[in-house]
Design a protein with these regions (language model features):
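An N-terminal assembly and electron-transfer interface module characteristic of large anaerobic redox
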Residues: 1-465
């Protein structure tokens, strides 16, 4: 059943029973997430973390011909400062205390007109914040009024920053608004390209996948990240859709299939040799270019076999902190290189991505599993207990692992997708191993020994309804 009749997307907690509080073992996590609903837990102590507003802003900021307005106080308006591109610009309504009482509609109207006159965008996105959600400002009236005046789509992104503990909800909210207000609802014909859905991947990751698609002569468009408004509108005309990270883009792919009959080719994340091979062969089978794809994959495999030592990580204990959809691919790759995965962390588990846990059954069932958005103090506890040699992370804030004596391999701003990503990860490990000896006697970290001697799930409790 399509969710597009709803005004906005449900949170992951409501739609898919997302769990973002767990600290235990792989076996325990599989057991707790195996029912028709996932048993919820809470953290009685929690570190600060990102929210869905930040995730929504991040993906919208990569759409090339759109203007973004952060409708809220100046603190929320500053989220654009995280952008690396100094030329990137956005707008804030800069709501103050008076606006929370009398309403901020006039400031929003002014911001929309200014954005249109200065940037001449093809669409304007208005991102919600806690102040607007609490005030319940009439954003839709402003949209209806100004759309007639300026003649382009003005789209409300119904984020609030506090109703969900799962930031990926921000991607769902963006997806819902794009489907409901922007994508062409009456495609006249199917075009000879596929949709490649990307929400969080770097431009380097996209380039690695595009390299393989071009080798197979597959026409494509990437969306919504690094796309244009016209490309997003054309998503309903594609011959098929693939998703680079299923737990982020699956919602968009399924709705395109259900509402617009664009087939969704379900694949795993194209990380590592096996993951990339499975991704390409599944796509090639649908597009009937299997022979070409098989030849291409065989050539790449032969080159990888010549270039990579399968004993690089012998004797190394590894903790993986990443999106759950990518952890099985990481774990396979690191195990094939001789490493031992002793634990992992992921932001959430829900009814859809929990199938990734079964792909980890080749690991010891007693390895540590930490589910939470951030929560580095718990991961420091796990690293200290597990005597981890290498901490692999997709996220910001990895210095705590170095403080615990682990060598950090960060995949942020690196191309880890596709076959090229195997070389990038391999080279990163070579450098990490070279540096690991220099960390002997490293500082024991910012977290007290008394905390690290406690059970890692000290603050994680069963939710009582």
């Amino acid at each position: 059943m399509s969710f597009l009749e709803d005004r906005k997307a449900l949170t992951r907690e409501k739609r898919l029973s997302a769990l973002s509080h767990f600290h235990g073992t792989l076996e325990g996590l599989i057991d707790e997430t195996s029912g028709t609903e996932i048993k919820q837990r809470v953290r009685t102590y929690s570190q600060i973390h990102v929210d869905e507003t930040i995730y929504a802003f991040d993906v919208l900021s990569k759409i090339e011909d759109a203007a973004i307005i952060v409708n809220g106080a100046i603190g929320c308006g500053n989220i654009g400062l995280t952008q690396i591109d100094e030329a990137f610009g956005w707008y804030s309504t800069n709501l103050v205390e008076r606006d929370t009482i009398l309403g901020g509609e006039d400031k929003l109207r002014e911001a929309v007109i200014r954005a249109y006159e200065e940037q001449h965008p093809k669409a304007v996105f208005i991102i919600g914040t806690p102040v607007v959600a609490i005030n319940n400002d009439d954003v839709n009236s402003i949209i209806l009024e100004l759309e007639d005046e300026i003649g382009i789509p003005i789209i409300s992104i119904y984020t609030d920053g506090f109703k969900s503990k799962t930031p990926v909800t921000g991607y769902d909210i963006v997806t819902h608004s794009l489907l409901k207000y922007l994508i062409d609802k009456n495609p006249e014909e199917t075009k000879p390209f596929i949709n490649v859905i990307s929400f969080s991947e770097s431009i380097e990751d996209i380039a690695a996948i595009v390299k393989s698609l071009k080798a197979l002569d597959i026409k494509y468009q990437v969306l919504p990240r690094f796309s244009s408004i016209d490309e997003i509108k054309a998503a309903s005309k594609a011959k098929a859709t693939v998703v680079l990270n299923p737990e982020e883009g699956g919602y968009l792919a399924r709705e395109l299939e259900e509402v617009y009959d664009v087939p969704y080719i379900v694949t795993e994340a194209p990380v590592g040799f096996r993951g990339t091979k499975a991704f390409l062969l599944k796509l090639a089978a649908y597009l009937k270019v299997e022979d070409k794809a098989s030849k291409y994959v065989d050539e790449v495999e032969a080159e990888l076999t010549r270039s990579i030592s399968k004993h690089l990580l012998d004797g190394k204990k590894i903790f993986i902190d990443a999106s759950l959809s990518r952890i099985p691919a990481y774990a396979r790759l690191f195990t094939n290189l001789g490493g031992e995965v002793v634990g992992f962390g992921a932001p959430f588990v829900d009814l859809e991505n929990r199938n990734q846990l079964s792909k980890l059954r080749f690991l010891s069932k007693g390895i540590t599993a930490v589910i939470g958005n951030g929560q580095y103090f718990e991961k420091a506890n796990a690293i200290a207990k597990g005597e981890v040699d290498i901490y692999v992370s997709e996220f910001q804030g990895s210095s705590f692992a170095s403080d615990e004596g682990a060598t950090v391999v960060s995949t942020r701003n690196k191309s880890i997708y596709g076959f090229d990503g195997v070389y990038v990860l391999y080279d990163s490990f070579v450098k990490a191993i070279r540096l690991s000896g220099k960390l002997q006697g490293a500082d024991k970290g910012n977290y007290k020994i008394s905390w690290k001697s406690k059970s890692g799930n000290w603050y994680v409790k069963q939710e009582v309804s």
